Regions:
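Small-residue-rich helix-interface/hinge motifs
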Residues: 2-34, 56-113, 147-152, 156-176
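Lipid-exposed faces of alpha-helical membrane segments in multi-pass integral membrane proteins
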Residues: 30-34, 60, 64, 118, ...
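Membrane interfacial helix motifs at helix-loop boundaries and amphipathic/re-entrant anchors
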Residues: 36-58, 132-151, 207-223
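Membrane-interface alpha-helices at helix entry/exit sites of multi-pass transporters
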Residues: 110-113, 183-193
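Interfacial segments of multi-pass membrane proteins
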Residues: 173-186
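Membrane-interfacial segments at transmembrane helix termini in multi-pass membrane proteins
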Residues: 218-267
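Bateman (tandem CBS) regulatory domains
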Residues: 249-263, 270, 312-326
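The conserved cystathionine-beta-synthase
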Residues: 263-282, 288-289, 298, 304-308, ...
């Protein structure tokens, strides 16, 4: 397990599946701790004879199995994309769940819908398998853990299919509107507005249902309503902004903004980077792995600061920083390019443009922001 970081984010690399790296955000440990504490009373009720340390250990099985369910959800997205000919850059498991990054845009409504539906389908299959196992497992602690995991997968599957961004169901709705109207941006904006309505419904459900039953909403229920409602509202708003931005970006062209870049193998030392000619600004250094995929960038100033005697023994990675997948853009023109740029500049101070032929160049964030400013500002 190795640590990678980019754009200020740090995560642990757990390994790879099908050649695609799997990362875990450290914040997931907080989720695991909270879930363990919440599940501990259930374990103690099901197995009262267990000592507290053993009960805590048993309670950790729930977040671990839930982790496997989230990973299965993301692997299903990635597997569907690969089956449809799309590259998958990485799987990331985070505080709020996970996400899958793709190497190119989901180019058609059908592809977008199929890839989006694969994740909830995986959770649905796990719920069905769990339900079948519950019929043969003897009552006791294993059955309680299995039942909790089964119900959780069923809830995750159903919740993710709700038709509003940023949920998978919202992506499916976006694809449907895209197919009917021929305009993806209309689908993104529409799914975003439905997501906002859904956020309000979620909050109302948690708060108003207890009142309708003559009970006061609990503090825990109110907290969950606030957190889930905020997440859905934020994701829905981002979908609306992205749709509007793409709609107004038909004339956007990234190519004039590209700066030269020198491509170097990530396994090389600092000495492998030749010095720039006198009076010429050194190009950005882009690190690639043996497969040619961009993995990081090195600042020329940091390279120049390495003393000559130790340059051959200093690996490039010592003066480089990893890039998040969103900082590598594959589209150069129009709304697709602007959409990738919008995601990338929020995660990194430099973007790397690539094509099927390799690295095309880099664009610093400040250059992009200046180019995106409206005239007269």
């Amino acid at each position: 397990m190795t640590i990678a970081g980019g754009g200020g984010a740090r995560r642990w690399r757990l390994g790879s599946v099908g050649g695609t790296p799997v990362y875990l955000a450290p914040s997931w440990l907080l989720v695991a701790a909270v879930l363990t504490l919440l599940f501990l009373p259930t374990v103690q009720l099901a197995a009262p004879r267990l000592s507290t340390p053993v009960a805590v250990l048993a309670a950790t099985s729930f977040p671990i199995l839930l982790f496997a369910s989230v990973l299965a959800h993301e692997l299903a997205h990635g597997g569907a994309a690969k089956a449809l000919g799309l590259p998958v850059r990485e799987y990331v498991l985070t505080f709020w769940g996970g996400h899958t990054s793709f190497g190119s845009d989901l180019r058609t409504p059908g592809v977008s819908a199929l890839v989006s539906a694969a994740g909830p389908l995986a959770n649905g299959v796990l719920a069905v398998v769990g339900w079948g196992l519950l019929r043969v497992v003897e009552p006791g602690l294993p059955a309680v853990i299995l039942a909790s995991l089964t119900y959780t997968n069923a809830i995750v599957a159903v919740f993710n299919l709700l038709p509003g961004s940023p949920l998978d169901g919202g992506r499916i709705l976006e694809a449907l509107v895209w197919k009917v109207t021929g305009d993806r941006d209309t689908g993104a904006i529409g799914a975003g507005w439905v997501g906002r309505v859904l956020a309000g419904v979620i909050v109302a459900w948690f708060l108003l249902v207890p009142l309708a039953q003559g009970r006061q909403p609990t503090l825990t229920g109110a907290a969950w309503a606030a957190v889930i409602g905020y997440l859905v509202w934020s994701g829905a708003s981002q979908s609306i902004r992205l749709g509007r931005a793409r709609r107004s970006a038909a004339g956007f062209d990234l190519r004039p903004l590209l700066r030269p870049a020198q491509v170097v193998d990530v396994r090389a030392s600092v000495a492998a980077v030749p010095a720039a000619p006198w009076g010429v600004a050194p190009p950005a250094i882009v690190l690639v792995d043996p497969a040619g995929s961009v993995v990081g960038v090195a600042d020329p100033a940091a390279l120049a600061a390495v003393p000559g005697p130790v340059r051959p023994s200093t690996p490039l990675t010592a003066v480089a920083r990893a890039l998040p997948a969103t900082a590598v853009v594959t589209a150069l023109q129009g709304s697709a390019a602007l959409g990738q740029v919008a995601r990338g500049i929020g995660a990194s101070d430099v973007l790397v443009a690539v094509s099927e032929h390799g690295v095309l160049g880099v664009v610093p964030r400040d250059v992009l922001l200046a180019a995106l400013q409206p005239p007269g500002r």
